Design a protein with these regions (language model features):
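Extended, intrinsically disordered, low-complexity segments
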Residues: 7, 249-307
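Alpha/beta enzyme core
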Residues: 2-246, 297-307
């Protein structure tokens, strides 16, 4: 889509609060809700496109494919979770990141994971009552290997509107790993990364990080517990966290689909779903506009036929 708003420009104006998306409809919902930027979640893409957990199943072709489709129809900047770059060699990472930039990404996260995604394993182990630390689950590659990928991503983004976000996966749960995380973040900044993302989970983490890592920072996925937000956005903005994301639409979509599906299945008719409008809009035209801009394409078709 031409004349898109630039992610870098939005960052210069203030804090951005962005939902994670995974397809054109979730991106459309974000637009209609008023969000000014979108985060393409690697996990949500794996769930929706492949029906698989976030364990490294997604390929660069799949991520490029959905990036291009979302950016073709949505006016807001799309920031892409590019995992470990989908390769070990920095030249492979360079080519992959260049493809994402060409597909329309205005931000790319490049992380230091091994390619074996650890979050799913960590939470699964906890659910089974196993004793496992986040450091054991979220393994990372050697610092210099990751930095070569950061450098390759920066080269792929050079001269474009795409922002490189260096994502440090080293946990902050002990002094040794905290120091390593800060070393990685500082080195990535020295290479030219405009934004840093770390495993911050609370305001205390944010304050510790802000002492060492200056400039733009990304807060990955705010949450809440017992109805209380884990952080206040204004508080973390003061510490340099000007890009904050959250998971919402995969949850909302599954909740809605299960609710409508269960009601219709129970009633053996479509009364429940037909009595509940789409997106809070009353008329059929308004409901259809929540999906796609029908008028634009129908009118354009009519214009082409007017010889």
């Amino acid at each position: 889509m031409e004349n898109k708003v630039k992610f870098r420009d939005l960052l210069s104006e203030g804090q951005i609060f962005a939902p994670c998306v995974y397809d054109c409809l979730s991106a459309r919902a974000a637009d209609l809700c008023g969000y000014k930027a979108l985060m393409l979640s690697g996990g949500a893409v794996s769930y929706s496109m492949d029906g698989l957990p976030d364990m490294g199943f997604s390929t660069i072709d799949e991520v490029v494919w959905i990036t291009e489709r979302i950016t073709n129809v949505n006016p807001w900047p799309l920031i892409v979770d590019a995992d470990d770059g989908f390769g070990e060699s920095p030249v492979v990472v360079y080519r992959n990141m260049h493809r994402l930039v060409k597909a329309g990404a205005m931000g790319i996260t490049i992380d230091d994971s091994t390619g074996i995604r650890g979050a799913e394993r960590f939470f699964y182990a906890l659910a089974k009552g196993e004793k496992i630390t986040i450091s054991e689950a979220m393994k990372v590659v050697p610092r210099d290997l990751w930095l070569t990928k950061v450098k390759a991503t920066l080269a792929a983004c050079e001269g474009t509107d795409c922002v490189t976000i260096a994502r440090v996966g080293v946990p902050l749960n002990n002094q040794e790993s905290f120091i390593e995380a800060m070393e990685r973040a500082v080195r990535a900044k020295e290479l030219g990364a405009e934004m840093i993302m770390l495993n911050v989970h609370n305001l205390e983490d944010a304050r510790r990080v802000a002492k060492y890592v200056k400039g733009w920072k990304m807060w990955p996925d705010v949450t809440s517990k017992d109805g209380v937000p884990d952080v206040n956005l204004d508080d973390v903005y003061e510490l340099g966290f000007n890009f904050v994301t959250m998971h919402i639409f995969e949850k909302a979509a599954m909740y809605g689909m299960m609710k409508y599906g269960l009601e219709n299945f129970k009633n053996q008719n479509a009364v429940y779903s037909e009595m509940h409008d789409m997106g809070g809009y009353a008329t059929f035209k308004q409901q259809m506009m929540t999906l796609v801009d029908h008028e634009k394409w129908i009118d354009l078709e009519a214009d082409f036929k007017n010889l």
